[in-house]
Amino acid sequence: MGNVPAKETRSRSSSSVSDYRNSTSSTTHGSSSSTSSKRRNTTSSLYGIVSSATSSSNHHNRSGSHDLRKLKRQEEKEQAQIQHYMQLIVKFNESVDGGYLAPFGTYKSNLDYDCDIVRNLIINRKLSPFFTPLQDFDESWTDDELCILLGQLTLHALEPGYNNDDDEEEDDIDNHKIHKSANYYKRQEEKAKLKSLINKVKELQKDEEQKYFDEKQKNFNKDCPSRDLLLRLYRNASECPICFLYYPKHLNISRCCLQPICSECFVQIKRLDPHPPHDDQSNQEAGELPHRLISEPANCPYCASPDFGVTYEPPIDIHTGIDGIKPGDYRVSPPIVEESESAIDDDGDNSSNGSTTGKGEITSNSATAAAAATATPPPVNSISPKKNSLKKRRGSLAANAPGVITIDMIRPDWETKLNSARSKLARKAATASAIHASNLLLDDNSNSNSNNGNGNNSGNNRRRNNSSSGRSGSFGGSNNRYATVEQRMIEEAMRLSILDEEERKRNANKENKK
C-alpha cells in the first residue's frame, strides 16, 4: 500500500504524461508543417528564379532587337549621306546638252535637295542642266578669244564648294560645359564622319578635274565638248538675275513672271523651317493649338508669288550627252532658210529653161544640186528664223500645270520634317501640361494640409488615435493624385492625337481638290 501513489500524485503524474504526449504531438505537427512550408518556399523561389530568368531573357532579346534596328537605321542614314555627297561630284562624262548633272559650286550651303530627282529631271530635259558659268561676258569677243576663255574653265569651283569647313563650323553649346550632355559625344562623332566624307569628296573632285584636263590635252575624247558646241552655247550668253553669272541662254523660266533663273540658284530656294503662324490668329480653326507649326511654300524671288516653280524648253538643235550624241561629235549645220515665192518662181523658170537647152545641162544641174545636198545636209532639228520670231509669248502657269517643276518636287521630304517637328512640339506640350497638372494637385494638397494644421488639439488627438486610418488615407490620396495626373496626361495625348489626325485629313482633302 505504501508503494501506491496518492490521489494527488497520480493526477499530477498522469497530467504530466499527457502534457508530454501533447507537446510531442504538437512538436511533430509543427515540424511537419514547417517542413511543408519550407518546401513551398523552395518551390516558389525556384519558380521565381525561372520566371525572372525568362523575363530577363525576353527583355534582353527585345533590347537586342531594338539595338539592331537602331543600328540598321543609322547605317542606312550614313549610306544615304555618302551617296548624296558622291552625287555632288561633277563628272565630265555625265553631261546633258553641254551642262552637267551636279552643281558648279557657286553656293556652299542648301545642297540638301534630292539628287536623284534633280538628275532625272535634267536627263529627261525637264530642268536646265548645271552649266559652267562665266564671270563676265562681252559680245565684242571673237570666237578665238571666247574659246580660249572657255578652255580655262574647270568642272567645279576652285574654292571649297561644300559647307562644314573649320571656319564655318557651328559652335556646340556643350563645348563650354563641364558636364557634357548625353548626345554630345555622338554629335562630335557625326561631325568627324561628315568632315572626313567632305574631304574625301574634295579629293575625288580634284581627281576628276585632273582627268578632265588630261583628256582635253589629248584632244580626241568624245566626252569633251567640241568647239562648235561651246560657241553655240556661250556665243549669246545671258546673265542670271540672282547670281549675276553668265550662262547659255537656255535657262529655266519662272512659271509666274517668266524670268530666267539658273539651276544653281533654283536648287537653293527651299521652304522655311516649320514655324508658328505669323498671320492674324482670328482665322485660326477651332480646336487648333495657338502654337501650331506650319510650313509655307517657297515664294518666287522676283514677284513673291507662292509655290514657286519653273519650266524649261531644251534647245531643239542640241541633243548631246546622255541619250544623245557625244559632245565631241557636235557640229553646227547651217539653218534652213525659207525662200520667197518669187525665188521659187525664178528657180522654176531656170529649171524649165535648163530643160530646153539640152540633155547635158539637165544632168549637170542635177549633179550640182546633189553635190550641194551632200555637202550641207539639212539639220534634224533646225528651224528658220522667221518661224522662231513668230513664237508667241506664253502667260503664267499654275503650279500643278504639266511641265512645271516646283520646289517641293526636288525636296519631297518637307512634309516629313513638318510632321516630325509637330510631334516634337506635341510631346513638349504634353509634358508641360502634365507638370502643370501635378503642380496644381500639389498646391491643393498643401493648402488642405495647412487648413488641417490650424485645427484644435482634439483634431490632433483624433489623428493620434486614428493613426493607422490616417496613414492608409494618405496612401490612398497619393494614389488618387497619381491616377489623376496620369489620366490628364492620357487625355492631353489623345487630344493632340485627334488634332493631328484632323490636320492630316484636311491636308488630304486639299490635295484631292487640287
Curated annotation (Swiss-Prot):
Ranges of Basic and acidic residues composition bias in the record: 64-79
Biased composition (Acidic residues): 340-349
Name of the protein this chain belongs to: Protein SIP5
Organism the protein comes from: Candida albicans (strain SC5314 / ATCC MYA-2876)
One Gene Ontology CC term in the entry: cytoplasm
Spans annotated as Disordered: 1-79, 340-396, 442-481
The organism's place on the tree of life at top rank: Eukaryota
A GO biological process held by the record: cellular response to glucose starvation
Main location: cytoplasm
Upper taxonomic lineage: Eukaryota, Fungi, Dikarya, Ascomycota, Saccharomycotina
Homology family: Belongs to the SIP5 family.
Cellular localization per UniProt: Cytoplasm
Role played: May negatively regulate the SNF1 kinase.
Sequence ranges of Low complexity compositional bias: 12-36, 445-481
Keywords from the named record: Cytoplasm
